[in-house]
């Protein structure tokens, strides 16, 4: 018994040394087993499932569905620009009576402070002069009597459009209306032209002196015959459309001060087409031309028809105020860069038709959500309850299909 106990104690005291054989590893190119797992990065899920920022979503709302979010002022354009900006959103609502036996042209051009330009001509005639209708906030944002007072060029250095939209909502009696509405887009641009003019001051009376003038190009696209890409429908159906950025990436534009924008090239005996400030510029002047398309509405009213409608226009503009401007105190830091919002914008702008009827306007944001779903694969990119509900299950899109 004693010997057994001693043997057990001796065994317990023995130090057991074990050696582990090293197994040679094959080169990476010759391995056949599963690849070793890499450590998961903390932000890997965010990279795989990017989400729109709040500023990016506000930008898309203002760009494509301004009527659905009229009280949302927007937060600017979430691109690579960094600085102080002032974002404003204008809305104009007016009742329009269309003259029988005429073609009425409503031109919504990216001129800061102006809701639209209007011209009335005989049926089939070529319009030449379009008189502007300013927004009610023109005096607040750009100064009243800007021809002789403080113009916009003294308050802001540059501007750019985030969005511009227009809707025609007929209010005619169903038994009295007649006619049609056509909608299309044109590209207008300002160019510099060096023109000779006779001056009575310098260098001497009667001597020609060159000066640089701003002229407009593209007005010939506003004509009686609509281009191939257009929306055509009955007047009673109305129409809604929006403009989109036609520059590289929301380029900043300079402010100017002009009483009119006239064509630079007039062919043959044609009359020069022009955009005019109302009242000869005593209260307002044309402030510039922005970076988005121009919207053209042509309403044809036959003899005996009684056509009336509500015309609404919206725009979202981003401004760079001068530090000595009274509006500088209302400016804020530009929104952070959101590449997903910009990618969605450039994909969305080419997927929608030129225009839709006014009754389809009420569900336009739902159409934007459907296209977002096609682009991103899931609506979970949208922050807030919408993204939470739709993550992984696509239920929201199914509700709107």
Swiss-Prot record:
Ca(2+) 2 binds at residues 249, 251. GO terms for molecular function: aspartic-type endopeptidase activity; metal ion binding. The active site is at residue 68. Disulfide bonds join 62-316. InterPro entries: Peptidase_A6, Viral_coat. It comes from the Viruses. GO terms for biological process: proteolysis; symbiont entry into host cell via permeabilization of host membrane. It is an enzyme of class 3 (hydrolase). Ca(2+) 1 binds at residue 272. Its EC number is 3.4.23.44. Residues 1-43 are annotated as: Disordered. Ca(2+) 3 binds at residue 272. GO terms for cellular component: T=3 icosahedral viral capsid. Residues 1-16 have a biased composition (Basic residues). The record marks 361-362 as: Cleavage. The keyword Calcium applies. It holds the Pfam family Peptidase_A6. Keywords: Aspartyl protease, Calcium, Capsid protein, Disulfide bond, Hydrolase, Metal-binding, Protease, T=3 icosahedral capsid protein, Viral penetration into host cytoplasm, Viral penetration via permeabilization of host membrane, Virion, Virus entry into host cell. Belongs to the peptidase A6 family. This is Capsid protein alpha. It comes from Pariacoto virus (PaV).
